[in-house]
């Protein structure tokens, strides 16, 4: 990457505060990115504190390695946070993590660097993979998927109401030549979109759906939440920042499910109720959003919502 793309960490102080960091605590940043949350958290930890960072992005890993070289309390791992359970177990830390942070937003360097293929505003190769060395690219998916599958991805993951029209236009155009550039795909999608939303690029939802599918973002989120709960110590905090309704719905339902427990599903006249049916999480406060001040400084924070829970057992 030749250019430097600035990233502003969303809900920085709020997220670190929500973790209630202890100086000698052991924490996990499941979405290291460019290290904004990790650096702020390290400032709260003492000499005995530890922080484990995860990311799939090779550029994020380079940033993480630089931070690890200057601060021995930090370790960076090139894995999806969906695999954090395996890593935590391998390090003998299961049930000993004091806080897990997941910031689910795509970082600005990823969005703004045309070579990563995420942007419909800046032309680049149609890739969209968080880790370009793994999985199929967006171009490969668009080239080989059936029209119905493309429409499903746009509708299910992008919540795009004109998904079928867009998929049909894509399949018709790819018979002439393959899609290799983001601008090329964005142009076809734009023409197929008959009703643009004011203030929103007509390719926004379709590109979101494609990115989520290529990176299995929702599946990873479900696995990561389960693994985070098992990794936490009793009293440990789970802090999740999501950026669209599909993510937030998964986070909300997960936290509510474990805050409610399974007692309601049992017969009322049972003489003894096992603890395995009791709640595992306690919800802490209401969802938090970016302040007016943060919105002015970083418009991309407008869709961020943070939810916090504490492990009970």
From Swiss-Prot:
It catalyses: cytidine(1402) in 16S rRNA + S-adenosyl-L-methionine = N(4)-methylcytidine(1402) in 16S rRNA + S-adenosyl-L-homocysteine + H(+). GO terms for biological process: rRNA base methylation. S-adenosyl-L-methionine binds at residues 35-37, 55, 81, 103, 110. Pfam families: Methyltransf_5. It is found in: Cytoplasm. Its EC number is 2.1.1.199. Keywords: Cytoplasm, Methyltransferase, rRNA processing, S-adenosyl-L-methionine, Transferase. Specifically methylates the N4 position of cytidine in position 1402 (C1402) of 16S rRNA. This is Ribosomal RNA small subunit methyltransferase H. It comes from Pseudomonas aeruginosa (strain LESB58). The lineage of its organism: Bacteria, Pseudomonadati, Pseudomonadota, Gammaproteobacteria, Pseudomonadales. The gene is rsmH.
